[in-house]
């Protein structure tokens, strides 16, 4: 069950299946370190902490800005409403996608703290076990046409729900030990009507493959994208 709880100028939205006692400490990496529950980390725009909850392993991420503006205003966003905060929006989008059968992480808890006209935010979501992103995998070996088709199918499922993944790239697509395809990182993504943006998602993904082929010499060829599109079009 999805519930919310207010703590002064802070609010938590959470799934009571995974969080029985919502508290602000859940979003503090030092709390998890003191409990000896940090099981790993990953570094990107900031540090994502992997923490062990009683029934699930979670990824704790603090929302940070990127680009030049992010150097000036690192983690403050304009407050409009609780539902419009980055964390709450991503939480509910993940819930919508999972209910539609798309392979995305379970949303566990979202946090936002209002500071006057601005807010800061964090998200706890499921850590996908035994999974690697496409960049990591393709630096080691190529993928079969069948796996590329499965990637295309998963993207098509997301599009059928009407969700625009505005940062669809090969860092945000995972494959686990069972060869299940997962799509992650839905910050700033949103539901959208129409179809034109779907091709924009695919074009962005193809640019990502080409970029990493030059940058990291990944094992990827143009024919692999045709296999991905075959899977995608099979769902249309």
Swiss-Prot record:
Keyword Transcription regulation: no
Protein's UniProt keywords contain Kinase: yes
Database matches in Gene3D superfamilies: Transferase(Phosphotransferase) domain 1 (1.10.510.10)
Pfam families documented for this protein: Kdo
Catalytic reaction annotation: an alpha-Kdo-(2->6)-lipid IVA + ATP = a 4-O-phospho-alpha-Kdo-(2->6)-lipid IVA + ADP + H(+)
Membrane topology: Peripheral membrane protein
Signal peptide region: none
Record GO terms (molecular function): ATP binding; kinase activity; phosphotransferase activity, alcohol group as acceptor
Keywords: ATP-binding, Cell inner membrane, Cell membrane, Kinase, Lipopolysaccharide biosynthesis, Membrane, Nucleotide-binding, Transferase
Source superkingdom: Bacteria
SUPFAM superfamilies found in the cross-reference section: Protein kinase-like (PK-like)
EC assignment: 2.7.1.166
Gene Ontology biological-process annotations: lipopolysaccharide core region biosynthetic process
GO cellular component, one term: plasma membrane
Main location, first listed in the record: membrane
Active-site residues per Swiss-Prot or TrEMBL entry: 167
Pathway annotation from the record: Bacterial outer membrane biogenesis; LPS core biosynthesis
Subcellular location: Cell inner membrane
Enzyme class: transferase
Protein function: Catalyzes the ATP-dependent phosphorylation of the 3-deoxy-D-manno-octulosonic acid (Kdo) residue in Kdo-lipid IV(A) at the 4-OH position.
Family statement drawn from the similarity comment of this UniProt entry: Belongs to the protein kinase superfamily. KdkA/RfaP family.
Protein name in the entry: 3-deoxy-D-manno-octulosonic acid kinase
Originating gene: kdkA
């Amino acid at each position: 069950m999805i519930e919310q709880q207010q703590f002064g100028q802070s609010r938590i939205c959470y799934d009571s299946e995974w969080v029985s006692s919502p508290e602000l400490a859940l979003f503090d990496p030092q709390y998890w370190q003191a409990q000896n529950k940090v099981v790993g980390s990953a570094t990107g725009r900031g540090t994502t902490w992997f923490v062990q909850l009683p029934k699930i392993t979670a990824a704790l991420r603090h929302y940070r800005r990127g680009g030049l503006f992010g150097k000036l205003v690192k983690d403050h966003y304009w407050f409009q409403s609780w539902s419009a905060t980055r964390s709450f929006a991503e939480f509910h989008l993940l819930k919508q996608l999972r209910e539609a059968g798309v392979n995305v992480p379970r949303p566990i808890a979202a946090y936002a703290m209002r500071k006057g006209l601005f807010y800061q935010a964090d998200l706890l979501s499921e850590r996908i076990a035994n999974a690697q992103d496409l960049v990591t995998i393709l630096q080691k070996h190529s993928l079969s046409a069948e796996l590329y088709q499965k990637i295309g199918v998963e993207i098509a499922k997301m599009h059928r729900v009407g969700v625009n993944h505005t940062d669809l790239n090969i860092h945000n697509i995972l494959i686990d030990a069972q060869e299940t395809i997962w799509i992650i990182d839905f910050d700033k993504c949103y539901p959208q009507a129409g179809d034109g943006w779907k091709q924009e998602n695919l074009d962005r993904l193809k640019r990502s493959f080409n970029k990493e082929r030059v940058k990291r010499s990944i094992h990827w060829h143009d024919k692999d994208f045709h296999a991905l599109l075959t899977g995608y079009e099979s769902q249309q």
